[in-house]
C-alpha cells in the first residue's frame, strides 16, 4: 500500500526537477547578457545636442543576443554607433549590436558607443544618467552612467 503512494510521489518529484533544470538552462542561454564594466559618459560643452555613453556588455549565455534599442531620459533618442574610418576620415554609423555567446561588446572612445541625440540638458561632470538597454533575448537592462570630464578616456574613479 505504501509503495503505491511513494512511487507516484517520487515520479512527480523527478519530473518536476527535470522541468526546473530544463527551464534554468533555457534562461541561462537567453538571459546571459551582463554589464561587465562601469558605464560612463563624457561631459558635454555648453550648447551640445549630442553625447556618448560607454560600457562593456558581455554575453555569458549560450545563445547570441542583440541590443535592439537604447533609451535615456537624458536625450530625445539614443542608438548604438560605431566609429569607422573611410578614406582617412572618421565617421559614425549605427551598428546592429549583435553579441555572440562568450563574446563582449566593448564601448570606448573612438569605437562603439551609445550616441545620445537631442540632449535634454548638458551632461555635467559628476552627474549620473540612466540608460536602458533593450536586448532581443535578455530584455531590458538599466545602467547608471557616471559623467566624467570633457575628453576623459575612462570612467570616473
Question: Model-derived features: where do they sit?
Answer:
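Bacterial N-terminal signal peptides
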Residues: 10-22
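Positively charged n-region of N-terminal signal peptides that target proteins for export
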Residues: 1-5
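Compact, glycine-rich, soluble single-domain proteins
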Residues: 25-157
